[in-house]
C-alpha cells in the first residue's frame, strides 16, 4: 500500500451580503465569505491538501476563479470532483484532520454535521474526518473578524 500526506490552507474575507458556508453547511451569521465560489474555506483547504498529496497541483489550477463554470458553485461539488481526480491516480481518502480559525460564529455545535457532510462527499467514515475550531485570541485579521481561515492535513492511500 502506498500512503501520501498533503497539507492545505485557505482564507477568505468576511463581508456583509454573502451567505456563510463552512464544511459544506450554511451557518446563520451576519457576514459571509467573499469568493468566486461559495468560498467554503474548510472545503477548499481539504481540496488543496488532497490535490497536494496526489501531486496534482492545487484547487486554483483545477477550478480557476476566473471560470464562469465555478461562479458561486457549491464547494461540495469541488470536493467530489477532487476526490474523483485523485481516484484517477488510484488514490482514496484515508483521513482528514482540519482546523478552522474564526472568532465568530462559534463552531463547536456545527462540527458533527460538517463531519457527516464531508464524510459523505469523500466516501469515508465520519471517524475519518476530524474538524477542530479555534480562534486567534483576537489577533490578526481573523481576530478582528475580517476573515476566516482553515488548515487541513490529509492522508491518501492506494493499494
Question: Predicted segments — roles?
Answer:
Residues 111-115, 145:
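Short, low-complexity, polybasic intrinsically disordered segments
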Residues 131-135:
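Pyridoxal 5′-phosphate
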Residues 2-112, 122:
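RNase III-family endoribonuclease catalytic core
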Residues 142-159:
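C-terminal edge-of-domain segments
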Residues 125-128:
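Short acidic capping loops at alpha-helix termini that bridge into adjacent secondary structure
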Amino acid at each position: 500500500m502506498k500512503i501520501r500526506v498533503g497539507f492545505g490552507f485557505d482564507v477568505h474575507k468576511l463581508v456583509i451580503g454573502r451567505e456563510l458556508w463552512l464544511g459544506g453547511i450554511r451557518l446563520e451569521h451576519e457576514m459571509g465569505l467573499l469568493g468566486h465560489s461559495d468560498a467554503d474555506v474548510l472545503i477548499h483547504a481539504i481540496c488543496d491538501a488532497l490535490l497536494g498529496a496526489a501531486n496534482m497541483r492545487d484547487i486554483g489550477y483545477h477550478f480557476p476563479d476566473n471560470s464562469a463554470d465555478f461562479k458561486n458553485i457549491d464547494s461540495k461539488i469541488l470536493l467530489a470532483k477532487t476526490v474523483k481526480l485523485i481516484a484517477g491516480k488510484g488514490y482514496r481518502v484515508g483521513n482528514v484532520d482540519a482546523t478552522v480559525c474564526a472568532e465568530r460564529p462559534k463552531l463547536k455545535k456545527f462540527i458533527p454535521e460538517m463531519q457527516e457532510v464531508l464524510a459523505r462527499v469523500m466516501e469515508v467514515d465520519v471517524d475519518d474526518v476530524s474538524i477542530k475550531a479555534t480562534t486567534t485570541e483576537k489577533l490578526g485579521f481573523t481576530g478582528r473578524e475580517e476573515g476566516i481561515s482553515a488548515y487541513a492535513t490529509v492522508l491518501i492511500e492506494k493499494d
